[in-house]
């Protein structure tokens, strides 16, 4: 037990470094913390010096068996390798581990899934009050699930949602009037004092990302959409505002992206509308 506590302490020191020296955002730290803890629970070692490439490969196999995509596994692997390199720099040795032999998984092309306004309305008919709010805020505001999970009262100002997003970038978005009215009702009925999404009314115990993902998936499944994942709503937000006239630069700002190339990957399903856009933006006569 003492050695296990020692590992926990070493991880805490690494996370403190990420927070105070690297100045990583709250959601980035939350993700790193979860990945590190889950990794150690899977491999079950008493000391970091026991870590080997066999442990890494077994962890990758376990992630694959759980249905994680190659892209997800590689993202988690990058976080683990960053932690291990930090430990090496701090003088911790891994006699049985060769970092250069850690190989990334083969990635399939990313799923290009998005939903139209009509499909979202169809899904919302199956949602209860909380499920409706979670889905609608993601679609209205283009939120990442980590941003949705971390929402607090201090982030709300009327219809505006202001927060620190990915890469510690300040961002604001706006919800519909209907969503605001329903959210106000939720806050009042559940006696919200800090975190918006709580497990028990009146208590400031926030839901986990996994809790929220489960709640959002249920109405999509009932509406006939079997392979829902929350980030598809962010793609849906981007495609929806593009279809209604937003420029790529405007879409970039509304999503909070640093690079326009990232935004381009979020816009789908415009094929049937290209003639309209050419006529509107290219061939309009004075």
At which residue positions do the language-model features occur?
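Conserved catalytic core of the tyrosine transesterase superfamily
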Residues: 1-286
